[in-house]
A protein has these predicted regions:
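N-lobe entry segment of adenylate-forming
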Residues: 1-97, 101-104, 108-114, 195-200, ...
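Conserved AMP-binding/adenylate-forming core of the ANL superfamily
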Residues: 18-23, 71, 85-139, 156-161, ...
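Conserved pre-ATP/AMP-binding loop-to-beta segment of ANL
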Residues: 81-83, 206, 218-238, 245, ...
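Conserved AMP-binding loop of ANL adenylate-forming enzymes
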Residues: 122, 126, 268-281
Length: 281
């Protein structure tokens, strides 16, 4: 479909996938602009220039002037025809979370964040498991234009603080318990240690209080969507810390919108209605 799109709109022809890949490498600006067009990326503010090269390379700018929202591109696919999330942990049955339930939970968590004064550019953390309520917490954070970062609950407090303390976070989401290998672990003491050790954290919200999902009649447009600049951070990851303190790895919002659309469709051939699983911490 993408190759046909390039033929129809750009008069480009490729004999095979390798030729397409080589074109994308040799013509980066044209390639990434075509991704925005093929996937109909919604820019709240249009871009001025696609690509502004610079030396050193990390000062290169993409889609200058553009504003957009990652959360918007998630919720624009909402449909009652299929679930948003299918979830199971070691101690639960399989549950399906509808798009309406995800919208309602995201809205509820976003209202809490707004009450706590979280605004665009603030950092919100999560020390918890991969779960539907964690997804909703991320979407609530992202929709406000705030920055997300997270650590797995099996991390020790020192490892977490080494990472999170670099970010001057305002709010910490956390799960008090998690199950692994047939055992349930209580980390409430670790949560308090982290919160007390990082002075910037003003409030801790326990995701254990948000395990239930309902079909509250919340419309998508009731979730506040705050567009951010293309290169504004969406989340902060960290290196392993094996050669010194963990180093922050910042991903841009627009970069992740484009990369996820491109990677899931062109590399992994994920199509509408299919189910996708990514094994990760």
């Amino acid at each position: 479909e993408y190759i046909s799109f390039l033929a129809d709109t750009k008069s480009l022809a490729f004999k095979d996938y390798d030729a397409l890949h080589q074109w994308s490498v040799d013509n980066q600006a044209a390639f990434w602009e075509s991704i925005t067009q093929f996937f109909k990326v919604d820019f709240d503010t249009p871009y001025e220039e696609v690509y502004v090269p610079a030396t050193p390379f990390w000062k290169t700018k993409w889609f200058t002037g553009a504003q957009l929202s990652y959360a918007h591109h998630v919720f624009r696919n909402a449909t009652p025809a299929q679930p948003a999330i299918i979830y199971q942990n070691e101690t639960s049955e399989v549950v399906e979370i509808s798009w309406q339930q995800l919208i309602a939970k995201t809205h509820a968590l976003q209202q809490q964040l707004k009450t706590l004064g979280v605004v665009k550019g603030d950092v919100v953390l999560c020390y918890g498991i991969n779960s539907p309520e964690t997804v909703a917490a991320f979407l609530a954070t992202n929709a406000l234009g705030a920055v997300w970062s997270s650590c797995s609950p099996d991390f020790g407090t020192d490892a977490v603080c080494e990472r999170f303390a670099q970010l001057s976070p305002k709010v910490l989401f956390a799960h008090q318990q998690y199950a692994y290998g047939g055992k349930v672990y209580d980390i409430s003491t670790k949560i308090k240690t982290i919160s007390d050790s990082i002075g910037a954290i003003q409030n801790t919200l326990l995701l254990d209080d948000h395990l239930s999902f309902d079909d509250a009649p919340v419309a998508i447009n009731q979730i506040h969507i705050e567009p951010v600049s293309f290169s504004d951070p969406i989340w902060v990851l960290f290196s392993s810390g094996t050669t010194g303190k963990p180093k922050a790895i910042v991903h841009g919002t627009g970069h992740m919108v484009l990369e996820h659309l491109k990677a899931l469709a062109l590399h992994q051939d994920v199509r509408k209605g299919e189910r996708y699983f990514w094994y990760s911490t």
